[in-house]
Structures are given as C-alpha cells and as structure tokens.
Amino acid sequence: MNKLVVELKNTTPLLVGWYTPRRADIRGLRTTEIKGIWRWWARAFIGGALYDEGLLNGVGTNDVLLRPSKKEVECIAKLVGIELGLGLAIARESQASRFTIYVEPLDSITPKDMRDRWRRISLLTIKKSVEGFDASHRFRLNVEWSRDFRYRLTALKILLIALQFTGVGKGSRRGLGSLDVVSISPSLEERDLRSLVREAYDECSELVRRHTKTYGARSSGNKAVELPPLPVVSKRTTSEVPVAEMKVFRDVHRGRFEDVHNFFVRTERCRVLYYSPICHDELRKEKAAWFLGLPRFQKERTQRETGYKAEVERRASPIMLAFHTDKNKFGSGAFVTCFLSGDWPKKIEWHGDHTEKPEKLNINAEAVVNAYKVFSNEFLRYLRGLNVGHQVDAIWP
C-alpha cells in the first residue's frame, strides 16, 4: 500500500457541519470535505486543459450564458475519475476511486458556538447558534492507493493546490476553514507553489492530448470562445484579462486577515473605503456586486426586496480566499483566486432601496469581464486602505 501523509492545521474558524448543519462533526475535519475540494480542482485543471486545446466550448441555454454540454461533462468526469483516479459514477462505466483517504485529529477538539466569532459567520448563521472549531487544531490527512498509475502524482499535486487555495466547510470561499500544510511525508521534491501549479497544468494538458479521442473530446473548430462554460485553470485571456488568476498577498498576517475577509461584507467594505458603514462603492454604482456570487437577494423589514435576483437560484462566487501562516509549506498570506466563466444567468434583476426603480441587467461575456474589473480595482483599493497588499506573488498565469 502506497501512502502520503499530510499534517494540516486550521488557520481560521472551521464550520464543517454534521448530520444536522448547525452541529459540528466531533472529528473536526471530514473526509467528504477534502474529497469535495480535490474533485473540484481536478475538474478545473482538466477543464482548463480542454478549454486551451479548443475542446471545451459549452452551449447556451434560455437562462444561462454558457453551460458545458452533456458530452463535455462526461469527458471531464472520465478524465478526472479514470485517469486521475478520483472515481467515476456513470452508469455502466462506474469506477471506484483509486485513493482511500481518512483524517485523524491530532489534538483534543471541542465544538464551540461560533455565531459571534467573525462577522461573516454571524451573517451565514443569521445569528443563530452554530457549532465550529477555533483555529490551530491539527489533523493528519492520510491518502492511500494500492498500486501506482500514470497520473497519480498529478492528482496528488492537485490535492495540495486545493488545500492552498480553498478552505473547507461553511464560508470556505471566504477563507473560513483554511488549512496550513505543515508537513508532507514522504516529502515531494522541494518546489514553490508557482511551480506546483504549472506542473499540474502541464501534466493535465498532456493527459488531455493523450486521451482526447478515448473519451470523446471533440473540437468545435472554434478556438475563439470568449469564456469557458465553467471555472477552469486556463492560460487564456479574454479582453486582456486572465480567465484564471491566482495571487498571494504575502504581507497579510493573522491580525489582518479577518479585515481582508470582511471585504465581502458591504458595511465593512464601506468602513474601510469611505469611513462609513453606508456608501455607494464602485460595486454598487456599477451594479456589479452580483459578481461576488448569487443570490444576493434579501428582504428589508418592510419586506421590500433588495439586492440581485435571477431565475437561477444559486451561483457560487468565482472568487476564493484562503489564509495561511508561516507554518505552511508554501508560505503565508492571503491566497486569492478568481475565475472568469460563462455559467451566469443571462438576466439578473437589481433592486435598490425605496427611492430606486428595479433594473434588469443583461449578462454577457463583456459584462462578466467588466464586473471582474470593478471587483479587482475595488479589492486592491480596499487592501491599500488596510495598508496591506504591497507584497504580491503572481502564482498563475
């Protein structure tokens, strides 16, 4: 039996849920959470390789700008499940994962009521009691496989990348549940994070070229698709903006990360940018805050609807945030990822306060790119307002 052992330490509050969402699994860290982010990033890397080869173009629907076609979904699933070994659940072709993973807590862990710990948690839980774990708990992640196969190291590299750029549990895209990689045994060859991402991408590109015909990937003959139909790790740009971007703001330390995390709470964003909890920031002025994720639709006490509304009930944020300390194998700071893709509703309805009329927004590739630019500019201004963000490592592209 081959084995990789990774020691992890959570750097931010961990809300993993259990058999009921407001309780916390007494083991602290669930294998299903790790498997979930591993598969998500594997799809992103394989999807990026397909997209860059002109093999992932998507199809438009009545409601959504772009979705991957049924054949594209199946192709990605097979490449991830069979070649990367993460398992496949397609009728008549199902295959168990070649990896077995399990997690062991390395210290005593006791769930606590987390509702008042961070501003974001209180918003997620609507001020109701929810169990979680404070930072600094240690876990051992064991990854086992019975026999070697061609792309096993590629899959393991993607796992390490997932642990760098994504947290686990509730609020994971906003930095909750971030996990330092404290040690890796046996140690992979020493490499920095930029090299690790590039190696994983190059190996996925080789995999895609090798198995294009095997799994039915077909070029539409159109390499000028503006956006991929799902978030992918791609080398391409659209309107001179990277389709995928990964950065590390190295000067964000523990005492500042909660402030960075609070960018996604509008009142806190306004406090930093305009010294007031109420403001018309650029995301508000340009009606671009939908880019932070849908739904953004709430009701005031008068029951008047405010925010963004779409026929599609949910669209997760394309922005991911994670935090690591100097104990992390790949360095410390705020790790930020942003993906541009076409899987947005074609129409979003914006509702302001009682003085403003609702407005219908038409979403196309240009609108997605423009919304990203508004977000990016405002986020950098916000970091400057916190006096951080001056030491930046560009990881990808």
Range-by-range predicted roles:
Residues 1-397:
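Basic, Gly/Ser/Thr-rich N-terminal segments that form RNA-phosphate-binding interfaces in CRISPR RAMP
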